[in-house]
A protein has these predicted regions:
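One-carbon transfer enzymes
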Residues: 1-191, 201, 238-241, 247, ...
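C-terminal active-site/capping subdomain that shapes the small-molecule cofactor and substrate pocket
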Residues: 183-271
Length: 271
């Protein structure tokens, strides 16, 4: 949906329509005989899946001669699941990447065909998503011509981790965590779902921050400084220095601008 909450076609569909490629958008696949018969009738050599988020039924996996392959946004077997990009940032990994894999009946458990990596540095979820999208397309184009002869590498299930689907409520900040983890979560959830805390009964979205390697004896969530261009908040470990904020119904703004028209009392506990 766009910002007016109206349904908007995904870019892939828009481009497919421009090229005259048939587009099918079933809500469910498993028992949709019309859809399944259409896919079977295409007599495809390979099915490519990207950002689908659901497990394909065995019937579909067995249709193409060369199988179904998935472009997954992590270095498998780490971060199987729906939100691998955000998980890699939150967990503090130094790098992440793309894995081209043969699809199996399990969730992201198939043999790995190709990988490409990139450093995470201080990237946001959106920045990393955009970078991995390009990497994934390039890696796919290098992999497809060799697909018939490629021998996949089995995943070591002992090294697997899971990245569950994200919801809006996951953006509610838990200040008992370390400042470093909270800052990583803020980057991972930028722009969606965003991270937020409550000041009395008002929700504030905390958009950008850095960490201070200082100790505080205040309760986690306590505002210990709010002046100039920052708001400092005590955490389970360290201090979170917020530099960009968003009030309800307003655009995101630098804390310096926010504090010109708003005040936050020292000692206020954000929840």
């Amino acid at each position: 949906r766009d910002r007016g909450r109206k349904r908007k076609a995904p870019p892939v569909k828009e481009r497919a329509v421009e090229l005259g490629i048939p587009v099918l958008q079933p809500e469910k696949i498993g028992k949709n005989r019309e859809f399944l018969d259409t896919i079977r009738g295409a007599d495809a050599d390979v099915i490519v899946v990207a950002a689908y988020g659901r497990i394909l039924p065995k019937e579909v996996l067995e249709m193409p001669a060369l199988g179904c392959i998935n472009i997954h946004g992590s270095l498998l077997p780490r971060f199987r699941g729906a939100a691998p990009i955000q998980a890699a940032i939150i967990e503090g990994d130094e790098e992440t990447g793309i894995t081209i894999m043969k699809m199996a009946e399990g969730l992201d458990t198939g043999d790995m065909l190709a990988k490409a990596s990139t450093p995470i540095d201080g990237k946001t979820g959106q920045q990393l998503h955009d970078e991995l999208s390009v990497m994934g397309a390039e890696l796919l184009m290098r992999t497809l011509p060799e697909l018939a002869s490629l021998e996949g590498e089995k995943q070591d299930d002992r090294l697997s981790t899971y990245a569950p689907m994200i919801s809006k409520k996951d953006g509610h900040i838990d200040f008992s965590q370390t400042a470093a983890r909270i800052e990583r979560t803020m980057r991972a959830f930028d722009p969606w779902p965003g991270t937020y805390a409550y000041c009395s009964d008002k929700m504030l979205k905390l958009r950008k921050a850095e960490t201070l390697d200082k100790a505080s004896d205040k309760e986690p969530g306590t505002v210990i400084e709010a002046e100039g261009d920052h708001i400092d908040i005590s955490c389970g470990e360290g201090i979170l220095r917020v530099t960009e904020i968003q009030a309800p119904g307003r655009k995101r703004a630098a804390v310096k601008e926010y504090l010109k028209g708003n005040s936050i009392e020292i000692g206020t506990v954000l929840g």
